[in-house]
């Protein structure tokens, strides 16, 4: 398909999904520096919150270095052309968080649910639209649902008021044909004015290819992160995606070289570990496991002596999804007992 001249809105994940590998410990100065770099490079939309969205600060998901209010309040006044978005997962974030985000100047709210649980998004999507916000329905772990099931869930979110629907490959499991099948079906079912988006992870090195497949299927919003900073092996690497789009004539409005500099000079130096496809993050993609489970599995591995890869494969076998982080340690402990390993950890 000829994509030359097609316009796409790129949505940066560095300061939200990138909080997962940073264990939510990004400083305000790091946030501001990277956000300003992204803004100057021409990125139109930048997501800023705890990795698990508004209200994510908790024992289950991790305590951040600063509150959502502090991060948003630091970044938004500095933006010259970029708008700022926030993620919200019903059950973690509340309507009060929505109002706080609106008051701070957030432009876009993305309401995220598991791909078969769109009905829990009604209150938050409805309220977001009442507040006049650009409102996105975000269907996570989309590889676990058939195209037909995704269509039914997308239509629910559209009916609640979402003006954009995302098909989200949270596990980095999908291949380009999987992406096309799902996004094509959803695109055909939505109103013409409802936008379609795609969020990928790079666990099988498919982030860029899947994003191009999504554009071919009708997506006009694509998520990516500078230097790929995100859960698992990271999100679609923004600087690579922008270069590929430039080669193909897809219009993003982002400067090819400035976004490279943001990735290399601002994002790579703050990484706690190199974001790459190691055996554990590769296993996320292969077994279809939620990407933010990676560090939880590594911690459980160190505690119980069961290889992280084995834990991740078992999580995939059990079909665990986002929100079940507390079950990762339980799974590792059970596996250790079954293997006769001595449980010395407190």
UniProtKB/Swiss-Prot annotation:
Its cofactor is Mn(2+); Cd(2+); Co(2+). SUPFAM superfamilies: Aldolase, post-HMGL domain-like. Changing residue 87 to N/W: Loss of aldolase activity (with either enantiomer of HOPA), but retains some decarboxylase activity for the smaller oxaloacetate substrate. PROSITE patterns: PYR_CT. The record marks 89 as: Important for aldehyde specificity. Pathway: Xenobiotic degradation; polychlorinated biphenyl degradation. Substrate binds at residues 16-17, 170, 199, 290. Mn(2+) binds at residues 17, 199, 201. Residues 8-260 form the Pyruvate carboxyltransferase domain. Changing residue 16 to A: Loss of aldol cleavage activity. Pfam families: DmpG_comm, HMGL-like. The record marks 290 as: Governs stereochemical control. GO terms for biological process: catabolic process; L-leucine biosynthetic process. InterPro entries: 2-IPM_HCS-like, 4OH_2_O-val_aldolase, Aldolase_TIM, DmpG_comm, DRE_TIM_HOA, PYR_CT. Activity increases from pH 6.5 to 9. Competitively inhibited by oxalate. Also inhibited by high concentrations of Cd(2+) (1 mM) in vitro. Appears to be allosterically activated by aldehyde turnover occurring in BphJ, partly via NADH. Heterotetramer composed of two BphI (aldolase) and two BphJ (dehydrogenase). The aldol addition reaction proceeds via a compulsory order mechanism, with pyruvate binding first. NCBIfam families: 4OH_2_O_val_ald (TIGR03217), PRK08195.1 (NF006049). This is 4-hydroxy-2-oxovalerate aldolase 4. The lineage of its organism: Bacteria, Pseudomonadati, Pseudomonadota, Betaproteobacteria, Burkholderiales. The gene is bphI.
